[in-house]
Amino acid sequence: MSITIKSAEDIAAMRVACRLASEVLDYITPHIKPGITTAEIDRLGAECMAQQGTVSATIGYQPPGYPPYPGHLCTSVNHVVCHGIPNDKPLKKGDIVNVDVTVITKDGWYGDNSRMFLIGECSIAAKRLSALTFDAMWLGIQQVRPGATLGDIGNAIQTFAEGHGLSVVREFCGHGIGQKFHEEPQILHYGRPGTGTVLEEGMVFTVEPMLNLGKREIKELGKDGWTIVTKDHSLSAQWEHTLVVTKTGYEVMTLSAGSPALPPFVTTTSC
């Protein structure tokens, strides 16, 4: 496994890419309300990227065995776990949707993040799922420092999630990122402390847990080749940040003016 350690210049470029990715989510946030379609959300995201001078990393993206992805964003509604394709179905009160944005800057750096959105008044269970998934992401992030392991991140997320009656999707994970969309290492959201790759200053990767209200099993929906849903049709939520390992801890880079407030137990976005 070859992990790319980023230089100070690389990290400076990634801060820009990550801020721009977060600002796409800021741009679309006021528009996400009952009646909007995910296709319109996708159009707004593309509009913002054009204004920034970035491009979408997802549109046309085609890893081996997959068809080209058709959207500028991923929009995963309710029981869709990830890779939901934007469509013309209006969102309604009570829906939850994850919007996942990855941009590429003119100089070839990637920034990747996602947020959950609650459409109108949602059920207590839906609100709880989104909030706990947000907290789980941050608990994972807080484990990051030189000398810690990937297993520390996964264990923190898994222990918290399962302790609150949620299940952790295991088939999808966080990933290294830089001048490629997906680099080593893979960041599992479950695991045992003290196991796996030891973290080093300059590593850059995403933490992006997917948690389900029901069981963890998932399946591919239909024949589009992308959309993943919970097998038991239970709600699923995901939050995502890109971060860099610093000399003493971590720095979350996918932050902007509209980023959600930190959980009460988090006092800083870098340490």
Where are these regions (language model features)?
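Active-site neighborhoods and metal-handling regions in enzymes and metal-associated proteins
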Residues: M1-C271
